[in-house]
């Protein structure tokens, strides 16, 4: 339904449970550049089913989990690792190109901007440890899309200048990452 502030959706299901019973409901929500791509991505998830999607996701995560000396250290390391992967990298909807971002939080004043220091000095080491192929893709992005403005304070994800001004740590972060 359309509201004054945009479009909203309500999804409901009615069911009854007897003692000891449980119930699951799965909603598939597709994303795409336009409505056909979004609908067919949801349809593909529906075709494969919840179990397949769950196994694929947990398999991907399990391949990247590191075991540390203690359970607590393992938990902290992997929580931070997956934060680094999921909040500093992503694929664009229009070109499916890998991009890196300093933050995806709407609370951060430069959400979805790119800073070499944040991505390469803070997130990259953990990503390199867990997923060398993704780390290589990040370096291609940095030395490709972001190359023309290395050393500039901050940039948009397409490489253009957001906040001008030279910063040595921004210039050296790609060198250190190599």
Give the ranges of each region predicted by the language model.
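Acidic/polar, glycine-enriched structural segments that form the non-catalytic walls/loops
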Residues: 1-113
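Aromatic-rich carbohydrate-recognition surfaces in CAZymes
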Residues: 46, 110-178
């Amino acid at each position: 339904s359309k509201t004054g502030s945009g479009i909203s959706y309500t999804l409901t299901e009615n069911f009854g449970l007897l003692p000891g019973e449980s119930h699951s409901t799965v909603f598939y929500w597709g994303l795409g550049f336009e409505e056909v791509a979004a609908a067919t991505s949801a349809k593909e998830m529906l075709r494969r089913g919840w179990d397949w999607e769950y196994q694929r996701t947990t398999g991907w995560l399990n391949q990247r989990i590191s075991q540390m000396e203690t359970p607590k250290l393992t938990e902290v390391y992997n929580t931070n690792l997956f934060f680094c992967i999921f909040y500093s990298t992503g694929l664009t909807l229009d070109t499916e190109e890998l991009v890196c971002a300093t933050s995806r939080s709407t609370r951060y004043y430069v959400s979805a901007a790119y800073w070499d220091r944040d991505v390469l000095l803070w997130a990259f080491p953990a990503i390199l440890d867990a997923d060398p192929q993704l780390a290589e893709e990040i370096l291609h992005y940095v030395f490709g899309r972001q190359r023309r403005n290395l050393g500039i304070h901050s940039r948009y994800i397409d490489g253009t200048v957001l906040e001008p001004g030279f910063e040595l740590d921004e210039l050296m972060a790609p060198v250190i990452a190599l």
